[in-house]
């Protein structure tokens, strides 16, 4: 795979030096070369290098090609945990392809990673409204509520989902996840309360000790 990338770079360099094509045609081939290199790096899971070469393709003025480049670049940003950069691209792509369910799902996911829960919730609710049989949107919404510790909504949506899709056995996984999140949250709350009480007890002891010393 490394040899493939090296070969692509070599061919691209030679092409840049010796090509006699027109400028537009030349740049088309240059961008195609960059894209091929980016794809190879992506396959090798060298996502930082893949992003570098996808970014070089962003000056391509072909609309369809540019859309594909942006989509692959956003995927790479997700791999690099660059949630904000990914969401910006998905927002751009949705302005053109505003009914694309996959783009909406990926945008909502990137919002969740940024803890922009309200924005993600709006997307999931909109998808559920327009596609009432979209099970993934329901389950993602339930998980969203669990992650933001809104367990009342999570459990309400979970019960509603089980009524709508009683034969979906995969919901057990979501149910377990919500249960684990709730348990973790309650344990953290209990620990925090114990710390507060301990701090208050220490404060009272110190205050009493000061009075006695006086």
Regions found by a protein language model. Name each.
Residues 43-44, 79, 113, 147, ...:
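Register position in tetratricopeptide repeats
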Residues 62-64, 98, 132, 166:
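Short coil turns that delineate tetratricopeptide repeat
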Residues 67-69, 103, 137, 171:
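TPR alpha-solenoid repeat register
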Residues 72, 106, 140, 174-177:
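Canonical tetratricopeptide repeat
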Residues 155-214:
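Terminal, low-structured helical/coil segments at or just beyond the last alpha-helical repeat
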